[in-house]
């Protein structure tokens, strides 16, 4: 739909025989289409006309612009209103929409039919006039126009009509008015969009007419201010005349009127790339007027201190030629430089080249004697070398005595005699023969290449950005003997500890045999020494792995990972794979890595608009095209390539910064990341990228190139649809490089937190193979998946197919036990079946695994992963063995035959168009058992509800006999697999405890602990007890506990887990918690507490020695400084301290509960939390349905599954609002519910009800004794009951949140109530709905709630509508599940309409009022 028509990819025959076929006369039938709309709207390039002079005499019928747009008719005012009409220009030949030049500009033009582009030049060429005759253009006398001169069309020059200027262009008086980037010039007399002082009044001799290019104040070339508000000025797209005859036009004297503009503001501020100067030697003698850096930044004036303060002033350097902002070299460095106008970049070298001095003469630089400067040596500018001025070193660089002082990442070297920012022992005194002068790169202790300490406090040292000399002549410089003075530095501290990227090694197979000296990771981090425990403690030591070659900090693979790796020196990143490539094994040798020399230029030329290739000019590429450096820039469908340096129309990361060796010049086709052939991003906004229209070169013996195998963390890349991987089982073993989802979205890198924050990182899933952005399955999902780069879609399954195994093509379906996830899978596009392909099924079709996807009425099946058009709960995650693949027909819930949901919104589901197979002895298949949970829904709607963490597994005795599949601890952490040593090394393995049932990561009790436990996947928490409760022994008796005989272990007693006595865990605290002596050690956000006696990661003064009476034991929550509640320092280096996840005790009887005495067995491991009693707050005894439907439309809750729900009623028994029980005597509701009557006697509450009208016998009805409204007018109120409610399995309070806690966006929560259901099923019964928290900033957008949501309110719902609070639900609860209980997060307050699209509900944020709530309850 986006491309109406295109020419075919055909070439014209050569007509080599000299004959040409006369085209036939084509007389088209008259068309009613408007002339400008008739298709096609472009002229064929082969039918090309030409014009003479400037085209005023042109009377042809061409009507297409240089960009292929159709011309607007001259008599039409749509889409552009104008004054070039046949009436105003009677002699202009303005017929229909033909190209014309009515007001003499450079060439014929027209207004376009594109509303976004007013006008363009026509795609015509100038006639050659080879015979020497020229047609005199017509005299066109236009009717006077009222259009402003600056508005007069046209406003661009045609690129084919190019003028030139002499010298610096001061004498130029042409009519060109387009810049080098194609922008239109602003009129010199106009102050819009840029205010300036270059006016005809101030520069009377400057020729400042209309918006023509000029050079009023002598700079390098003609320029102008632009009509783009974002770009003040640019040089014009003019070339310098060749002056081949030796004559030059003397520029006129331009005497400007004095200007008040500051020198640093004087325009222009950039040089035109075509006007390039050069310098001799190191540029000290350079006195040119260039003032642009190598990255295109404008120079700061030497006399200015903004934006950078410095000492290179004309006063301090009187002989340095420091005039205006021209490039200079006042203190001899490598080349001319300047300070920049960019506040973030202090200085850079100028974009100048060194003169060739081909004649053998060189200009002697003047002696520059600067005034003494007070600047510190490390501040002296410049701090970088110009890339074009590159030196080299011989051998390992010990003999190097050059003056280079920049590292491979562009950091400046620290002076060898300086101890700031890094203290070291490589000083001139200790290494007198090493040439440690100033901050020049050196190699004092022979390592791989010259290096230096950096001036960046976070990076100690790096190799220098030097290359090794070729030594082509066969001579090598012998490095001098360097005898350093003995150093006190430890052997392991010896620098350097990283390799230069230029010195690249490779490894074979998985790299277990690698014994090289590389010590840098894929992200450039330095490796930690294997014998060191700083910053990461570990067990991969030379002592434990004597044969693994764990020397110094070199990359190794001691434990059969997929490639060499190391621990890093970054405290926040435990380990990474090394930046090594796998050796390419051939018959005789290892292929060398391809050396790619990129274009050293970073000038603006790389930003030029892309061009198209003629079909006749066809390149070819070798191999996969990584070595291709041609200039082709057209895709296989004829689209033009986007420039690699441009982010329009497609944002990407394939830039020269990330791919410096990829040859990413202009918009040329390249293959920077090892695709199957060269490709590029396209200029079509609807097509992100395509392969280029290039062919592979014929392979000959001399044309085979070595393929680059560089491993990097480059930005992810889409896969070609033709390059498809497959995976085995559930894909946990998949290690391919596919990175595209089922909907074509690009995967987010696992190490990235943008656009989606997550915890699937290599730190938490070290064996998950989470490399780059490749599809993986780290947590036992049904197939490989990834987070997406689309901020609107968190994650999706990958576009991979399951591998076909064995000859019979039967897919092995693994037993998948998924980790519980709160993330909703994304949709997968359904497929259709060919009517001729008919399957059959056995029995009732539960065993059917075919690919049929059409119903008996011919409708297409909806994908099981999709919620469109029908929402449902039959997803692969809940039925892992039911074969719910794509949109194939299945029968996983014992229907009479296979069926599916349909793509027809009006038909929810139908049986599939399958027949039953004839029953024979060989055709009977074993039907898998798929047992759904019984439901009150219609059979066709049944779906098993999610397993709620609230209704838990249980164990008998001490849990040694437990063989369940629970794998979550009491704090919600995932268990580590018993056979894994990551992140915690241990000896509780299936081999050592063969009878203990140590399967996968399931909770077990192999060594007679108090109850089942496991090691956790959190590196900061070694082990915890599991979130299990003890079974009631009255129901089924005590199971016999098996005897577990462990294999003798060498583990020390202090390492054995668990070894301490099960602590008594206090779940609540009294007052402000100063008396709390429980063993809870987790904060409100789930972080683990830091030990009070530890100074890592946070240093503090709350130690047992300083606070001897506060019982600062281990890492237990305490309140040593009379804060508002118990707290602790956290193990997260980025979060110093937080309040603990404890609630205040109710103290309803008025007595203070004495904390129990806890006498733990001494242990080095922090204890964990014990499961609490069954009637604790937020823990219903009936499993909630957690229906994803809406209140409007009906989803009846399971009776008593939301036991804190209150029906607030009048004294006559009429329900009018909801409420939440938060303690036996207190109910929380909305203040708006109490507006009618202020007396408490008017209200009563109903507890434990499921039906609104016919109340059950167990319901509790209690009068209200007091009302408390929030004092500042928030929509929240407290009701005190006349007597305490009786807490039963049907009446349980909800838990209050921590004060001021802000719940994260997209958290799943639930609302409940008996409110208005608009006539849908289930009216009068308690209903529930799932909704998501939405950020207030999103809700406050003008298209949603337009700034009406306050910070003390939270927004939740579905922007598409369908789920919301309604009249009658006000005051009711919004609860969210957290770890093992439901927390009250909101009170239903207000919202425009009921379940309306783009109008989510608004709820009172309870955490903002916890202090007020607790104060009222405490004082009343």
From Swiss-Prot:
Lineage of source species: Eukaryota, Metazoa, Chordata, Craniata, Vertebrata
Stated name of the protein: Apolipoprotein(a)
One GO molecular-function entry: endopeptidase activity
Keyword Transferase among record annotations: no
Function: Apo(a) is the main constituent of lipoprotein(a) (Lp(a)). It has serine proteinase activity and is able of autoproteolysis. Inhibits tissue-type plasminogen activator 1. Lp(a) may be a ligand for megalin/Gp 330.
Low complexity bias spans: 19-30
Name of the gene: LPA
Protein's GO biological process: lipid transport; proteolysis
Organism the protein comes from: Macaca mulatta (Rhesus macaque)
Domain Peptidase S1: 1191-1418
């Amino acid at each position: 739909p986006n491309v109406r028509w295109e020419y075919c990819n055909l070439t014209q025959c050569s007509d080599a025989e000299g004959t040409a076929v006369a085209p036939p006369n084509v007389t088209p039938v008259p068309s009613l289409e408007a002339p400008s709309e008739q298709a096609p709207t472009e002229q064929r390039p082969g039918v090309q006309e030409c014009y003479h002079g400037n085209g005023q005499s042109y009377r042809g019928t061409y009507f297409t612009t240089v960009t292929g747009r159709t011309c607007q008719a001259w008599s039409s005012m749509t889409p552009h209103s104008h004054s070039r009409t046949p009436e105003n220009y009677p002699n202009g030949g303005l017929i229909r929409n033909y190209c014309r030049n009515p007001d003499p500009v450079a060439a014929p033009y027209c207004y376009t039919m594109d509303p976004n582009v007013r006008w363009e030049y026509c795609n015509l060429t100038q006639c050659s006039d080879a015979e020497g005759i020229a047609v005199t253009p017509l005299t066109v006398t236009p009717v006077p126009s009222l259009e402003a001169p600056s508005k007069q069309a046209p406003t661009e020059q045609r690129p084919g009509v190019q003028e030139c200027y002499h010298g610096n262009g001061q004498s130029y008086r042409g009519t060109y008015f387009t810049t080098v980037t194609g922008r239109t010039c602003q009129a010199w007399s106009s102050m819009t969009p840029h205010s300036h002082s270059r006016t005809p009044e101030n520069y009377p001799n400057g020729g400042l007419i209309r918006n023509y290019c000029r050079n009023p104040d002598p700079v390098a070339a003609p320029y102008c201010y632009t009509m783009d508000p974002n770009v003040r000025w640019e040089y014009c797209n003019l070339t310098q005349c060749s002056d081949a005859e030796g004559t030059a036009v003397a520029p006129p004297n331009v005497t400007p009127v004095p200007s008040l503009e500051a020198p640093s503001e004087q325009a222009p501020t950039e040089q035109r790339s075509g006007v390039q100067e050069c310098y001799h030697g190191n540029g000290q003698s350079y006195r040119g007027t260039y003032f642009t850096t190598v990255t295109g930044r404008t120079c700061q004036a030497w006399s200015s201190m903004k934006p950078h303060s410095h000492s290179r002033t004309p006063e301090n350097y009187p002989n340095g030629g420091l005039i205006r902002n021209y490039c200079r070299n006042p203190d001899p460095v490598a080349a001319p430089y300047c300070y920049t106008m960019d506040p973030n970049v202090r200085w850079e070298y100028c974009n100048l080249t060194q003169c060739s001095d081909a004649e053998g003469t060189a200009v002697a630089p003047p002696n520059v004697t600067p005034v003494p400067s007070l600047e510190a040596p490390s501040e002296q500018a410049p701090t970088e070398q110009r890339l074009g001025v590159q030196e080299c070193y011989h051998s390992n660089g010990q003999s190097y005595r050059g003056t280079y002082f920049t590292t491979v990442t562009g950091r400046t070297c620290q002076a060898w005699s300086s101890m700031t920012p890094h203290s070291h022992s490589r000083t001139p005194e200790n290494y007198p023969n090493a040439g440690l002068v100033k901050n020049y790169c050196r190699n004092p202790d022979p390592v791989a290449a010259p290096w230096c300490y950096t001036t960046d406090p976070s990076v100690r040292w790096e190799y220098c950005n030097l290359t090794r000399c070729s030594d082509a002549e066969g001579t090598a410089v012998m490095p001098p003997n360097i005898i350093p003075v003995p150093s006190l530095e430890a052997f392991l501290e010896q620098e350097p500890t990283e390799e230069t990227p230029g010195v690249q090694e490779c490894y074979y197979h998985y790299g277990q045999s690698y014994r090289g000296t590389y010590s840098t990771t894929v992200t450039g981090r330095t490796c930690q020494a294997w014998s060191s425990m700083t910053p990461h403690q570990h067990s991969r030591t030379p002592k434990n792995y004597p044969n693994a070659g764990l020397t110094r900090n070199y990359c190794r693979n001691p434990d059969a990972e997929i490639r060499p790796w190391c621990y890093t020196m970054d405290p926040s990143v435990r380990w990474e794979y090394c930046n090594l490539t796998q050796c390419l094994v051939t018959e005789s040798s290892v292929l060398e890595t391809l050396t790619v020399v990129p274009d050293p230029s970073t000038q603006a030329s790389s930003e030029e608009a892309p061009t198209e290739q003629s079909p006749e000019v066809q390149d070819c590429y070798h191999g996969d095209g990584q070595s291709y450096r041609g200039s082709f820039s057209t895709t296989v469908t004829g689209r033009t390539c986007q420039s690699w340096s441009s982010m329009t129309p497609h944002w990407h990361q394939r830039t020269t910064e990330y791919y410096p060796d990829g040859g990413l010049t202009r918009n040329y086709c390249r293959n920077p990341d090892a695709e199957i052939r060269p490709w590029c991003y396209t200029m079509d906004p609807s097509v992100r990228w395509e392969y280029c229209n290039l062919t592979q070169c014929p392979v000959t013996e001399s044309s085979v190139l070595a393929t680059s195998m560089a491993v990097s963390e480059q930005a992810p890349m889409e896969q070609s649809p033709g390059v498809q991987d497959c995976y085995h089982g559930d894909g946990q073993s998949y290690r391919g490089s596919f990175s595209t989802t089922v909907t074509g979205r690009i995967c987010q890198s696992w190490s990235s937190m943008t656009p989606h924050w997550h915890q699937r990182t290599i730190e938490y899933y070290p064996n998950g193979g989470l490399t780059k952005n490749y599809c993986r399955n780290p947590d036992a999902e049904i197939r490989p998946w990834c987070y997406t780069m689309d901020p609107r879609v968190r994650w999706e399954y990958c576009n991979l197919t399951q591998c076909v195994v064995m000859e019979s093509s039967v897919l092995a379906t693994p037993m998948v036990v998924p980790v519980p996830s709160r993330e909703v899978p994304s949709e997968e596009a359904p497929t259709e079946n060919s009517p001729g392909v008919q399957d059959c099924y056995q029995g009732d079709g539960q065993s059917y695994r075919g690919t049929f996807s059409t119903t008996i009425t011919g409708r297409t099946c909806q994908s099981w992963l999709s919620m469109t058009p029908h929402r449902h709960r039959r997803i692969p995650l809940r039925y892992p063995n039911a074969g719910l693949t794509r949109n194939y027909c299945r029968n996983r819930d014992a229907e009479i035959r296979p069926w599916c949901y349909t793509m027809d919104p009006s038909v929810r589901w139908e049986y599939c168009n399958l027949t039953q197979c004839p029953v024979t002895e060989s055709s009977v298949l074993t039907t898998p058992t798929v047992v759904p949970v019984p439901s009150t829904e219609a059979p066709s709607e049944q779906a098993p509800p999610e397993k709620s963490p609230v209704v838990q597994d249980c164990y008998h005795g001490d849990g040694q006999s437990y063989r369940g599949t629970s794998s979550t601890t009491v704090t919600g952490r995932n268990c580590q697999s018993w056979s894994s040593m990551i992140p915690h090394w241990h000896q509780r393995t299936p081999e050592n405890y063969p009878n203990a049932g140590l399967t996968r990561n399931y909770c077990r009790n192999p060594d007679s602990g108090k109850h089942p436990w496991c090691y956790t996947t959190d590196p900061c928490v070694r082990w915890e007890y599991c979130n299990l409760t003890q079974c009631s022994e009255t129901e089924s008796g005590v199971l016999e506990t098996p005897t577990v005989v462990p294999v003798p272990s060498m583990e020390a007693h202090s390492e054995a887990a668990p070894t301490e006595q099960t602590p008594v865990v206090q779940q609540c605290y009294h007052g402000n918690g100063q008396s709390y002596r429980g063993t809870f050690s987790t904060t409100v956000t789930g972080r683990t507490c830091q030990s009070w006696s530890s100074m890592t990661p946070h240093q503090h003064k709350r130690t047992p020695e300083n606070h001897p009476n506060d019982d600062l034991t281990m890492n237990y929550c305490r309140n040593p400084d009379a804060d508002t509640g118990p707290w602790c320092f956290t193990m997260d280096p980025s979060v110093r301290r937080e309040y603990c996840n404890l609630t205040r005790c109710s103290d309803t009887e008025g007595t203070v509960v004495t904390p129990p005495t806890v006498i733990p067995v001494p242990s080095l491991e922090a204890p964990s939390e014990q499961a609490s009693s069954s009637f604790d707050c937020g823990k219903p005894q009936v499993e909630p349905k957690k229906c994803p439907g809406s209140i409007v439309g009906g989803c009846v809750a399971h009776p008593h599954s939301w036991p804190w729900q209150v029906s607030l009623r009048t004294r006559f028994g009429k329900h009018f609002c909801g409420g939440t029980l938060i303690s036996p005597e207190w109910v929380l509701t909305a203040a708006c519910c109490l507006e009618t009557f202020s007396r408490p006697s008017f209200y009563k509450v109903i507890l434990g009800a499921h039906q609104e009208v016919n109340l059950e016998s167990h319901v509790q009805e209690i009068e209200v004794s007091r009302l408390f409204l929030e004092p500042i007018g928030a929509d929240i109120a407290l009701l005190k009951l006349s007597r305490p409610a009786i807490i039963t399995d049907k009446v349980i309070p909800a838990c209050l949140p921590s004060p001021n806690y802000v719940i994260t966006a997209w958290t799943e929560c639930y609302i409940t109530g008996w409110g208005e259901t608009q006539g849908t099923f289930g009216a009068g019964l308690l209903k529930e709905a799932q909704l998501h928290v939405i950020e207030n900033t999103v809700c406050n957008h003008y298209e949603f709630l337009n700034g009406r949501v306050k910070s003390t309110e939270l927004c939740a719902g579905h922007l598409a509508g369908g789920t919301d609070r309604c009249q009658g639900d006000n005051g009711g609860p919004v609860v969210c599940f957290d770890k093992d209980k439901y927390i009250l997060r909101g009170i239903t307050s207000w919202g425009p309409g009921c379940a309306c699209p783009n109008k989510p509900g608004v709820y009172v944020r309870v955490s903002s009022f916890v202090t007020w709530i607790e104060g009222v309850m405490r004082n009343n």
